[in-house]
Curated annotation (Swiss-Prot):
It is an enzyme of class 3 (hydrolase). It is a peripheral membrane protein. This is Elongation factor 4. GTP binds at residues 19-24, 136-139. GO terms for molecular function: GTP binding; GTPase activity; ribosome binding. The gene is lepA.
Length: 602
């Protein structure tokens, strides 16, 4: 393997918004360079998870090595490092960009530049990548390549005079892209003589070999059977195998600076080999790790409960297995009077949450109830102390706290300007603070808002898409905590608090939400032998209340005529029984009721 000159290596990635044809383009590159034979080809070859193919998104990174004979009759090695395009996975994107020297910026010629593309382009520019603009889907009837080129120049400031028009589906322009990669993407720096450093840009769990780590050698070289040290986790391992992805794994004896490969070293869990960590040699380690490593912190939390209590052990095992391949997933056990045993889980964002839930249901065959998503609140206690809380039901009572702060995000929404009004309306409904509005082109606008994260994690994305016919796109990042007039809204069923329905809401919205919650529960909870009050409360103050009337059993049906005192005695006995029942009786809330209420727009 070492006969490859560093000057003949090109490491690049593809930046694109969801649905702009990134995976199809990757397939076409693999096919045209002969890396994957026609008969083995399947659509979206690099998206190995069924879920990725179905949703058409890239979740876990993949990498592939291609050999390409260029027009100058030299053979080059092209390493394609795949990146996820979704905002939840932006840290993973930033790491894979650090492993590259160039990027293909793929823009749909019929749709134009979208928010997440922009966010990733700025990351690429920060890493000094050579960016090659590619206009995909030029074969579509609605494609307007010239207009989109102008848009790229105006929005991003990239020179598009040598942008490439292509159609990944029909294969037009693929040769031009390969030539552009060879000519325009710089070769890696030749740092074979320096101490070994390699950047982990992805890892996944293999049940037979332990964690498989994808890495890019930045300096020095790695040999089979060497002992390695991971600088952030301070753990050391002996290499079992190293190799390249072509795109199936092939073992090699050595990889040197500039090359991209995989390693297996009997690593037990993905958390030990975090994305962004630096690999070095145990016997002659590098002095300092590569910059930019950070652990991904969850931003969105929810409770996961099995619908069948017997499945709790299975849920625990499945979460343990999932965590082996998803280091960003955090969980801890939680119990609830209404739902039984379950787990409180933390995720990077809403998409991450949906994917984990779907993988649990699909790969591990579980049936789950998911409580409403919440964020981490900062609760300032009276004694100048503060605590962070991710579960609304554990927030202290009003007399024990001074204020609640919630996380805010800075959000940029890109949309055609005819949707300006509806989007501003949506942001105002969600307590957004207007910051700025920029016209990027004559018919597209950027709205910048600062908005509470709690308002974004519910259904903001769906609402934004439906109000703009799918044309708007957004991206956001955390900007810190702010004090707000927030209250804990509890739901009491027969004077008992139902934890899964507790939420943190703004005081102005509390009445409306409380009202709709109790009305919905009244429809869904079946009648009992006694009257059930359903109340929404803030602290000790009831703000909305409904009651479910009792079922009436006719105790007088056996008395035909006869003395009135006999009837009175029976009625009195019934009233006494009902009183006792009300004091002792537990209301079984059906799970459908919880499901429906959780679906109620937050």
């Amino acid at each position: 393997m070492t006969d490859i000159l560093v000057s003949k290596i090109r490491n690049f990635c593809i930046i694109a918004h969801i649905d702009h044809g990134k995976s199809t383009l990757a397939d076409r590159l693999l096919q045209d360079t002969g890396t994957v034979q026609q008969r083995d080809m399947q659509e979206q070859f690099l998206d190995s998870m069924d879920l990725e193919r179905e949703r058409g998104i890239t979740i876990k990174l993949q990498a592939a090595r291609m050999k390409y004979k260029a027009d100058d009759s030299q053979e080059y090695v092209l390493n394609l490092i795949d990146t996820p395009g979704h905002v939840d996975f932006s840290y993973e994107v930033s790491r894979s960009l650090q492993a590259c020297e160039g990027a293909l910026l793929v823009v749909d010629a019929s749709q134009g530049v979208e928010a997440q593309t922009l966010a990733n382009v700025y990351l690429a520019l920060e890493n000094n990548l050579e960016i090659i603009p590619v206009l995909n889907k030029v074969d579509l009837p609605g494609a307007d390549a010239e207009k989109i080129k102008q848009e790229i120049e105006e929005i991003i400031g990239l020179d598009t005079s040598n942008a490439i028009n292509c159609s990944a589906k029909t294969g037009v322009g693929i040769k031009d892209i390969l030539e552009a990669i060879v000519r325009r993407v710089p070769a890696p720096q030749d740092e074979i003589k320096l101490p070994t450093k390699a950047l982990i840009f992805d890892s996944y769990y293999d049940p037979y070999r332990g964690v498989i780590v994808y890495f890019r050698v930045i300096s020095g070289s790695l040999n089979k059977r060497e002992k390695i040290l991971l600088m952030a986790s301070k753990k050391n391992y002996e290499l079992d195998e190293i190799g390249i992805m072509a795109p199936d794994q092939q073992q090699v004896d050595e990889l040197h600076a500039g090359e991209v490969g995989y390693l297996a070293a009997s690593i037990k869990s993905v958390a030990d080999a975090r994305v962004g960590d630096t690999i070095t040699l145990l016997n002659s380690p590098a002095n300092d790790p590569l910059p930019g490593y950070k652990t991904a912190n969850p931003m969105v939390f929810c409770g996961l409960f099995p619908t069948d209590a017997d499945q709790f052990p299975d849920l625990r095992v499945s979460l343990e297995k999932l965590q082996l391949s998803d280091a960003a997933l955090k969980y801890e056990p939680e119990t609830s009077s209404a739902m039984g045993f379950g787990f409180r889980c933390g995720f990077l964002g809403l998409l991450h949450m949906e994917i984990v839930q779907e993988r649990l249901e699909r790969e591990y065959d579980l049936d789950l109830i998911v409580t409403a998503p919440s964020v981490i609140y900062k609760v300032n206690l009276n004694q100048q102390e503060h605590i962070f809380i991710d579960n609304p039901s554990t927030i202290p009572d009003p007399q024990l706290r001074e204020s609640i702060e919630e996380p805010y995000v800075k959000m940029e929404i890109y949309a055609p300007n005819e949707f300006n009004g509806t989007l501003m309306g949506l942001c105002q409904e969600r307590r957004g603070v207007f910051i700025d509005m920029k016209y990027i082109t004559t018919d597209r606008v950027t709205l910048i808002y600062e908005i509470p994260l709690a308002e974004v994690v519910t259904d903001f994305f769906d609402q934004m898409k439906s109000r703009t016919q799918g044309y708007a796109s957004m991206e956001y990042h955390l900007i810190g905590y702010r004090k707000n007039d927030l209250v804990r809204l509890d739901v009491l069923i027969n004077s008992e608090r139902a934890d899964p329905l507790t939420s943190i809401v703004h005081k102005d919205k509390a009445y409306g939400i409380g009202r709709s919650l109790v009305e919905k529960l009244k429809e869904l909870i079946p009648k009992q032998q006694f009257k059930i009050p359903i109340q929404a409360s803030i602290g000790s103050r009831i703000i909305a209340s409904e009651s479910i009337s009792a079922l009436r059993k006719d105790v007088l049906s056996k008395c035909y005529g006869g003395d009135i005192s006999r009837k009175k005695k029976l009625l009195k006995k019934q009233a006494k029984g009902k009183k006792r029942m009300k004091a002792m009786g537990k209301v079984e809330v059906p799970q459908e009721a919880f499901m429906a209420v959780l679906k109620l727009n937050q």
